[in-house]
UniProtKB/Swiss-Prot annotation:
Its cofactor is Mg(2+); Mn(2+); Zn(2+). Its EC number is 3.6.1.-, 3.6.1.22. Residues 125-248 form the Nudix hydrolase domain. It holds the Pfam family Zn_ribbon_NUD. This is NAD-capped RNA hydrolase NudC. Gene3D superfamilies: 3.90.79.20, Nucleoside Triphosphate Pyrophosphohydrolase.
Length: 257
């Protein structure tokens, strides 16, 4: 699947190492390979954006290495491809040797996988399923400040799905563990690949059922009900959390305005 990049090769360039992304001038490189000193490098074609190829180059650059979060305000499709590149780069870096027999591995030529030529084991990129849920109580939405978000942003509740657990069970458990309340009338909304580091967010809306807010201090700094027209600082546009909040606000406006 990989190839040597030639002088006139063009497209979008995902240059990644250790979950970082090369962002000269704060943007994803776009254009001729020669303009970015990429001629002669090995590259994988990982997709297409606006009719042009998207290439992954496994390489560290001394300057301008940043987080994929810096391109979250790009078009959703391009952000997803950037996230794919960063996750694949980390997958290839962390799977150089077989976990069963210890022998060197090599990339598959037909799929995103690493193969062991000794014991024939096959490894795929790990994806961690997560739930994220907007909870409505009449004209209000439950928003919380997480311990890892010290910038004042309030968002909806989220968490990882545990082994042997359904998505619906994960929603009920995470909400109870983090806020102490029960929910009902769960409804699936959408999903979003989230490369921090390798999650797949499954988004839901739910209604408040019972209980008083009792936060888990290991997870949350605070949690409260906020009326739809009096909200605190929210996650940025482009995130599934922001979409859930905006969808909930739209439902409240339709009913209470």
């Amino acid at each position: 699947m990989d190839r040597i990049i030639e002088k006139l090769e063009s497209g979008w360039w995902i240059v990644s190492h250790e979950q970082k992304l090369w962002l000269p001038y704060g943007e994803l490189p776009h254009g001729l390979a020669a303009n970015f000193d990429l001629v002669g490098q090995r590259a994988l074609r990982i997709g297409e954006w606006q009719g042009e190829p998207v290439w992954l180059v496994l390489q560290h650059r001394r300057h301008d290495m940043g987080s994929v979060r810096q391109v979250i305000d790009q078009d959703a499709g391009l952000f997803q491809l950037a996230g794919r590149g960063v996750q694949l780069a980390e997958f290839y870096r962390s799977h150089k040797f077989c976990g069963y027999c210890g022998h060197p591995m090599h990339p598959s030529k037909t799929e995103w996988a690493m193969l062991c030529s000794h014991c024939r084991e096959r490894y795929y990129p790990q994806i961690a399923p997560c739930i994220i849920v907007a909870i409505r109580r009449e004209d209000s939405i439950l928003l919380a400040r997480h311990v890892r978000h010290r910038n004042g942003v309030h968002t909806v509740l989220a968490g990882f799905v545990e082994v042997g657990e359904t998505l619906e069970q994960a929603v009920a458990r995470e909400v109870m563990e983090e806020s102490g309340i029960k929910v009902k009338n769960l409804r699936y909304v959408t999903s979003q690949p989230w490369p921090f580091p390798q999650s797949l967010m499954t988004a839901f809306m739910a209604e408040y059922d019972s209980g008083e807010i009792v936060i888990d201090p290991k997870e949350l700094l605070e949690a409260n009900w906020y009326r739809y027209d009096d909200l605190p600082l929210l996650p940025p546009p482009g995130t599934v959390a922001r979409r859930l909040i905006e969808d909930t606000v739209a439902m409240c406006r339709a009913e209470y305005d």
